[in-house]
Structures are given as structure tokens and as C-alpha cells.
Amino acid sequence: MKVQGRDCTLTLLKDNEYYPLPYSEETVRQASKGYALPGCIGRRNREKLVETGKSITGCVVTRLEYNNILALFLLLFYSDDKFDILVDRVCTKLIYKNVSVKEFELRGENNEPLYFRLDVKDNDDSYVTSWDITTPSLPWTECRTFYYDGHSVIADSKTLPLVYRFELTGKFTEKTKYQITLYFPLSTEHYPTQNKIEKLTITLDQRLGIWLDLYDLKPLDDMTDVNCADTVLCFQKFEICGCVVFNIRNQSQNTQVVL
């Protein structure tokens, strides 16, 4: 993304390692926190907010690439660990210190790039500071971008004819919760899936051997057959009661991250 003819940069810093990301979108900011005072009864006064401090909130959206995919999934694995976000918006250069993962979304549409959204939250020692002379400006280096193939989704050893979109979400609160939504053309031959899916496999990149395995998927809603001659597009949401496994397996790397 360019602002005033210059590229913005977005970099994650964790354990003294820098991970430049392709700048797609980010809303990381400081938000006011406090309490509200109600207006006086009988008068048309607006509710007033008494500010007691600032909190860091927002999200980062980036494309999935070979240079960042493992680092992003390791952030989910160590969801309680803290990291920094370095943002160069041309007019301002800020560092959001000691934030952690609040939730995430991985989404893909058929023949389109895979996108990863990371929502952040602040901690007791979180703060915002400006770049100093020692802060490195690391431009993103273009590499292989991963594209989603809607014909490569496997449910219980059976390849589904088409899942044209999916959304995998996770929330890290007192109890970690994962859900996935599958979008597909309605077909009595392959759908609806009323029973739970024991294992769902989503290929992220066939060439480099990168995929996701999701275990013990329980449908959260029922499907209804529609007597229609035309194609009917629908979706079904599942709760992931088992684990989410991220895999990289090729000649140079054999890595597995279990969430």
C-alpha cells in the first residue's frame, strides 16, 4: 500500500526476530477507556465519558506467504506471549509494545489469495512509542503468495466437489474456541453434512506441502434440502471440538504446529 508515493510497512517483532508483512490493512490504535456519566434527567444533555486511560486495540490483515505463515501460526500457538507491532504509515511511525493475540481469522475464496486477520489486545505493560534511530525499517520482500483452491478440501477422506469459500476463526479468552464456516453449492449427493466431520483437510499450498488438519467438527446448524433447478449457494458453520494442526512437509522442512 502506498501513501503519498511511499510504501507503508508493517513488521512483527517477537523474541528479537523481525517479520515484515505485506501491508494489506491494519487498524491498530489507541482507544479511550473509562466510564460514562448519564445525562441529567429532564435535560437534553449528552452522555459524557470520563477517560481513565488508553488501551491498544485493532487488527492486522495480511496475505499468507511462505515467509510469514509459520511465524503467524506460532503466534497462535504461543497466544499468551507478547510481541511488538512496528507500523510505518509514512506520516507517523509507531511501535505498539507488548501486545498479545485476542483472536484471528483465516479466510480464503476460490482462486484468490489467502488472508490472515490478527486481532490484538493490550496488557498491563503495553504502551505506544515512536521509532528511534535504532529502529530498522524493513521493507516487505515479495515471495510466493498462497492461493486457495476450493477443490482441494477433504472431509473424512472424501474430496468435496467445491468449497468456494471458508472462514476459520479462533478466540483466545479463558477458553480457546475455534470455528469454521464452509461455503458451497447445495447438493444432495455431497451435502448437507448433518453429522460431525472427524477430519477436515484444507490445502494451503500443494507445491510446498502446506495444509491444515481440523479434527472433530460438530455442525452448529442444520441444513435443508431445496427443490430448485438452479444452483443454490449456502454455508454451514462448525465448531472445532478437536485440535487444529498446521503442517509444512517438503524436502527442506518438516514442521507441525498443534493448536
Regions found by a protein language model. Name each.
Residues 1-259:
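Signature of extracytoplasmic/envelope-associated structural regions
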